[in-house]
Structures are given as C-alpha cells and as structure tokens.
Amino acid sequence: MDEVQYDMYTTLATLYDTQDLTMPSSNAQRIGAIAETRFITECLERDFEPHTPTTPMPWDYIVHCPAGDLKVQIKSTSVRDRSAYTVNSSCGASVKGHMSDDIDVVGIYISPLQEWWMIPRYLIKSKTIKLYPENPSKSKYKQYQNNWSVYYE
C-alpha cells in the first residue's frame, strides 16, 4: 500500500467516533455485555435471527424465530442472596419504572451458572424477579430454566 493511500485510510479512521468501542466501565456492565453476546450466540446456534433496534426501545432484541418476531429484554445477574438470584424487572437506570408491556420475553442470564431463564413477560408481575436454580419448590419460574420453548410456540 502506498503512503498516500495509507494516509487516506488513517484520516478516515480518525473521523469515526470510537466512543462506542470503549469497554464497559463497571462489573455489572461487563456482565450485561457478556449476557447480550451469549444471547446472540444462543439465538444463532438455534437458527434464530436476533436484531437490535436502531433507536432506543424498551426491548434489547427482536428475535425472528419459529414463534414469530418476539421482543426480548435481556437481564443478567451474578449475585446470589441465600438461595435466590434477584433481578430488577424495571428498564433503564431507574428501578422505579416498570417493564414495558410491549416486551414478549425476558431473558435472564445467571452468569456464575452460565444458565438462561426465558420467561414470558406477561408472567412477571413484580418489580423484582427471584430465581431459585436449586430449589424447585420456591421458584415459580422453574419451568423456564434453560428452556427456550417460548421461541418455538
């Protein structure tokens, strides 16, 4: 590559804003980024098509799958409190808000267990979701543990 062409590419590269290429700044943001990346991988391995919205929406992905086009909100947690993993069901930075009724599925990734819970949105009534991976009698969402059937129904 000649020097003129190299300078042109270097100039073009500096015009792009690389702000979005920075690493997540907190551990929670890293866990969220890992969960979203794993979700995309899981979808592609199942021949689903995950699409991110181009404008801010209450869902993270629209997933084209055998059940149709589903709006999916991804949540993640790594903190265990006694026998439960707890996730806030609100969207955004505020825990006062509520989860949008436009969402079809809430995908929750428990990072230490590397496990997914795919819960239909209409079943979530409270601002916190408690998941009990080892205690089926306490968990009202146990049937959605590592269960992707909502994408096939």
Labelled PLM ranges:
Residues 70, 115-117, 127:
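Short beta-strand segments
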Residues 40-44, 70, 87-99, 150-153:
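Conserved functional hotspots at enzyme active or ligand-binding sites that engage polyanionic ligands
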Residues 2-4, 8-21, 124-153:
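Charged phosphate-binding loop/patch that engages nucleotide di/tri-phosphates or the phosphate backbone
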Residues 43, 61-63, 68-78:
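Conserved catalytic cores of phosphodiester-cleaving nucleases, focusing on short active-site segments
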Residues 8-51:
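Acidic-basic catalytic patches of nuclease active cores, encompassing PD-(D/E)XK
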Residues 26-28, 32, 46, 97-98, ...:
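Residue-level recognition of single "structural anchor" positions
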Residues 75-117, 121:
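Catalytic cores of nucleic-acid endonucleases
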Residues 54-56:
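Short, glycine-/polar-rich solvent-exposed loops and beta-turns at beta-strand/coil boundaries
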